[in-house]
Design a protein with these regions (language model features):
Chain B
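Condensing-enzyme catalytic core mediating Claisen C-C bond formation in acyl metabolism
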Residues: 1-191, 298-363, 416, 455, ...
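Conserved catalytic cysteine-centered active-site region
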Residues: 167-180, 184-188, 227-268, 272-279, ...
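Short, well-ordered amphipathic alpha-helical segments that serve as non-catalytic structural scaffolds
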Residues: 193-209, 238, 344-360, 395, ...
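Conserved beta-ketoacyl condensing-enzyme motif
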Residues: 193-252, 256-257, 362-393
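Structural signature of cysteine-dependent C-C bond-forming condensing enzymes
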Residues: 207-216, 246-251, 275-285, 358-364, ...
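Acidic, glycine-rich active-site loops and adjacent beta-strand->loop/helix elements
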Residues: 221-226, 257-262, 285-291, 455-460
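Short acidic, glycine/serine/threonine-rich loops at helix termini
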Residues: 229-232, 264-267, 292-298, 380-383, ...
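Flexible, glycine-rich active-site loops centered on histidine and acidic residues
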Residues: 275-310
């Protein structure tokens, strides 16, 4: 899937996949990360 | 010589009116959407005290059921009340809200908590029957004020109301005109946390049989901050709680680290005792009013009761090795370092695999892992999944990755080495700490030898760092006697022989 010209908002989960890990996965793609954070629901 | 886990206590406070008035999900909703359907429906989903007592995870928290017994019950648990459930448990109690409001007043040294005269008259006899609070604490409850004065303070003087069964029964007064850190809101949170830590400490004295004056140091590890505008997190809630609990010979300090703080505190307490600095150290934390009803929107939307209606608290006593109680093995401490990274695999590697490998052990050498022990009844309907299961699955996956476990054995691993969660979502409360009492007992009973307690903390919530955090340690069967036998010592005979040899050599040199 091409992420060219895609803008990304990342909301990670502390006990799932945290924001920085998702950011890491998007490195090397052409997606633009607008916002990234990890939230805690517990 | 390692330090040992001597006792643990666990308390809950049923706080239904605090859910409505002090939980941040509700206070935020009142600001942004004051006429919302959610706020209208919320009161219909609040549980009674008896319902909260009969709730299986709560009975587990205070020690009337084991995690194993809870795990045998089919989920969800909220509509399966425990027959014969009691307020008192092996490790503590579930205190009703009205009694707790009086305990909050007894924990207030600045005359900030004011209660309605009739409410005090009605509630105090119940608190006087409490077997563990004592006259010194009860004497701090005041006669009360007129209802009209209470209403005026809340409506006109920036006081924070205290409610019971929907009625205004008191308030917390602000302690400064402009300092937000001493606002009524902050003081209510801090006093609720302090009072629940006091209750946990009083139960710890009971479960340990230790006299109050024997405890030398208290570490408090909640997520609250106390101070004024010049030192917002000045702290020492530990000493504040120790004072009310009657620990006259104790000083203390606070450890902060979000949900990981208790595990940091256990490692520090164990180190203080191992170093010989103090002989008896208590680690304690009270509950969080802010987190009450945190996921209640989802619970209400799905027709469930509001399950986050209790404040949690615990206290743990760590003492010098007595040759009997389980050791806190400081040779096996895992830590999430600055360089670890945030991926779940990196986190669990740093907390579980690395410390075990350093000690020459395998993952399956640990009988039970206690990570985030949040009650899935609360988290699953809110979309956060089963948090403990997710943690155990990742630990099992690492065991598969290192080749010590077959892929097909993953579910069996989770069942054998994990457990269901039972703790209320009170942040620091579920993070490993609730298993300490059960682990101690299971090790003493010979049911297992080693448990790993894992604390994890979301530092990024404070917006100072994007870092995650965590620390782990191993609680294990006491090796005292065996270790002493194995360690080569010097006998009296050998000492005598060495002295005789030295004297002979000295005499020979004189002769020469």
């Amino acid at each position: 899937m091409s992420l060219l010209n895609r803008k990304i908002i990342i909301i990670g989960d502390r006990d799932g996949i945290p924001g920085p890990a998702i950011e890491e996965c998007l490195k090397g793609t052409e997606a633009e990360i607008l916002f990234s954070s990890t939230e805690c629901f517990v | 010589m390692n330090s040992v886990l001597t006792a643990a206590s666990y308390i809950l406070v049923h706080a239904p009116d605090m859910v409505v008035h002090n939980g941040t999900t509700q206070t935020t909703e009142r600001v942004v959407n004051p006429g919302s359907e959610y706020l209208k429906q919320l009161p219909e989903h609040i549980r009674s005290y008896d319902q909260a007592v009969a709730y299986a995870p709560n009975q587990t928290y205070i020690g009337n059921m084991t995690p194993g017994q809870l795990g045998e019950m089919e989920q969800p648990w909220h509509d399966m009340p425990v027959a014969g459930a009691t307020r008192e448990g092996r490790y503590g109690e579930i205190m009703p809200q009205d009694e707790f409001l009086l305990l909050m007043q007894a924990s207030d040294m600045f005359d900030l908590v004011r209660l309605d005269r009739a409410f005090v008259a009605k509630t105090k006899p119940a608190l006087e029957k409490h077997p563990l609070l004592g006259q010194e604490i009860l004497a701090l409850v005041k006669a009360g004020e007129d209802a009209s004065d209470i209403a005026r303070a809340v409506n006109e003087e920036h006081a924070e109301g205290l409610y019971h069964m929907g009625q205004l029964v008191g308030y917390v007064k602000r302690a400064h005109d402009v300092d937000a850190n001493l606002s009524a809101h902050v003081l209510l949170e801090n006093l609720a946390s302090k009072a629940s830590a006091v209750l946990a400490l009083r139960h710890l004295l009971h479960t340990s049989g230790v006299a109050p004056e024997e405890i030398e140091y208290v570490i408090e590890c909640s997520e609250e901050a106390c101070g004024d505008m010049n030192q917002r997190g000045g702290g020492n809630m530990a000493k504040a709680a120790a004072e009310v609990a009657g620990l006259g010979n104790a000083t203390g300090s606070d450890v902060r680290g979000f949900c990981a703080a208790p595990s940091h505190a256990f490692v520090m307490a164990a180190s203080l005792v191992k170093a010989g600095t103090f002989k008896k150290v208590a680690v304690t934390a009270g509950g969080s009013t802010a987190k009450l009803g945190m996921n209640a929107k989802d619970h209400v939307r799905k027709g469930l009761p509001v399950l986050e209606d209790v404040l949690g608290g615990f206290a743990v006593l760590i003492t010098a090795d007595d040759g009997k109680n389980p050791e806190i093995d400081l040779d096996i401490v895992g830590r999430h370092t600055v360089g670890t990274g945030a991926s779940p695999q990196a986190v669990i590697t740093s907390l579980v695999l690395s410390p075990l490998e350093r000690a020459g052990m395998k993952i399956q050498d640990i009988d039970k892992f206690a990570a985030e022990l949040q009650n899935p009844d609360i988290t699953k309907p809110a979309g956060a999944g089963d948090v403990p299961q997710a943690n155990f699955k990742m630990i099992g996956a690492l065991a598969v990755k290192t080749g010590e476990l077959d892929r097909g054995g993953l579910n069996g691993f989770i069942e054998q080495h994990g457990m269901v969660g039972w703790a209320p979502t009170q942040g620091h409360i579920p993070s490993g700490a609730p298993y300490m009492g059960f682990a101690r007992q299971a090790i003493l009973d010979g049911e297992m030898e080693k448990a790993m307690i894992i604390g994890k903390g979301s530092l990024f919530l404070g917006r100072l760092t994007n870092q995650f955090d965590g620390i782990s340690f191993v609680l294990r069967k006491n090796r005292g006697a065996a270790q002493q036998q194995q360690e080569p010592g010097i006998s009296k005979e050998e000492v005598r022989g060495m002295i005789a040899e030295a004297l002979r050599s000295f005499a020979a040199s004189m002769e020469g």
